[in-house]
């Protein structure tokens, strides 16, 4: 039976491998990819972020890495987008937390789906494509805030919303509700930084992305 230290080391190794694969495919994302530390957290059954760490259940990481490694690439990018759009910092401002979670997931997945990179490629289901087309017509720009307003103003359909959750959910948002304030802007020391090729960057809290 593995010790806690061994499990944490395995999880860190997997996430470092995922991060490296993403970096080799999307070097412009280097600063952002290096902005999150890794922390084992057995309060989650999967993986999530609090905008400082990617918090993971090692069993989930190991099983997914063996069976469907491409899902981890996608999930890592999904979590980075949540941080970029600062979704976790607005979570407590919305009355319906589950709906806010759903809208955040739709918003970030629409962005990731628009990124043409094999490492994060996912075949778009008919159901997903149908809803993208519907929302682009009725909401236009798919931000979490606009999507939340859209769903709040229409007749609520719990069955539909659950189907959408199953389609767009990739990470555990429970860490968002535990956050008290924004994290300090500092380099996490849990792993070495990703090399940065372009010094011209713009900062989004603790995330940085190239300006060109």
Regions found by a protein language model. Name each.
Residues 36-38, 129-131, 209:
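Short amphipathic alpha-helical surface micro-motifs
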Residues 96-197:
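Internal, well-ordered alpha/beta segment that forms a basic, Gly-enriched binding/recognition surface
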Residues 1-118:
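Basic/hydrophobic alpha-helical interface regions
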Residues 205-211:
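Conserved small/polar residues in nucleotide/adenosyl-binding loops
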């Amino acid at each position: 039976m593995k010790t806690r230290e061994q499990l944490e080391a395995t999880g860190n190794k997997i996430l470092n491998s995922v991060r490296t694969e993403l970096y080799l495919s999307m070097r412009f994302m280097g600063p952002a990819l290096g902005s999150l530390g890794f922390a084992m957290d057995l309060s989650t059954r999967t993986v999530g972020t609090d905008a400082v760490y990617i918090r993971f259940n090692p069993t989930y990481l190991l099983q997914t890495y063996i069976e469907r490694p491409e899902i981890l690439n996608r999930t890592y990018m999904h979590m980075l987008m949540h941080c970029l759009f600062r979704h976790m910092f607005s979570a407590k401002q919305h009355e319906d937390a589950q709906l806010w979670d759903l809208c955040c997931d739709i918003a970030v997945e629409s962005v990731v789906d628009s990124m043409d990179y094999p490492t994060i490629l996912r075949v778009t289901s008919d159901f997903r494509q149908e809803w993208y087309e519907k929302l682009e017509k009725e909401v236009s720009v798919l931000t979490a805030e606009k999507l939340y307003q859209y769903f709040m103003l229409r007749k609520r359909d719990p069955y539909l919303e659950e189907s959408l959750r199953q389609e767009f959910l990739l990470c555990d948002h429970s860490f968002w509700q535990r956050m008290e304030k924004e994290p300090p802007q500092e380099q996490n020391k849990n792993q070495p930084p990703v090399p940065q090729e372009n010094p011209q960057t713009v900062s989004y809290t603790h995330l940085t992305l190239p300006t060109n």
